[in-house]
Amino acid sequence: MINVLLVDDYPIMQQLLRDILQRYPDICVVGVAQNGEEAVLQSMKLKPTVVIIDINLPTISGMEATRLIKLQRPSTVVLGLTAGVPDQTVTAMRNAGAAAVLSKGDLLSALYPTIIEAMRSSAKPAFASASASPKH
């Protein structure tokens, strides 16, 4: 089961994300946060597999919240959401620890495949190092 924390300051976007994700039986939305500060706290409390976070949030930006989440729980996969920002902001979000940044306009077709791909990508280094270790 992929446990997901949704972070967006607009309830309508939260509901849209829920509606998209509830179509997939391997996804469980475990919580919702409305700002960056709540995102960091909920991530520590709920320990989601994936955090889907808007880049532009009140209190703490999505970028800063991503950095803090990854600092506290490096195994968490973070996906950024944007309504359209400059490339340098997307790059900065990736540098903060986001596995990917999605356009809100592409959520219906891209959200689930991006979650799966980001999880596969994040598992590769751990799997490779674990398989290279000798068994005792």
Where are the language model's segments positioned?
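Short hydrophobic/Thr-rich beta-strand motif most characteristic of the beta2 strand and flanking loop
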Residues: 26-34, 42
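Acidic catalytic/metal-coordinating carboxylates
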Residues: 35-38, 61-64
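Conserved phosphotransfer cores of two-component systems
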Residues: 44-46, 68-76, 96
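Alpha4 helix (beta4-alpha4-beta5 surface) of REC/receiver domains from two-component response regulators
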Residues: 64, 85-113, 117-118
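The feature encodes the CheY-like receiver
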Residues: 13, 58
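CheY-like receiver
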Residues: 113, 120-136
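Active-site beta3 strand of CheY-like receiver
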Residues: 46-52, 57
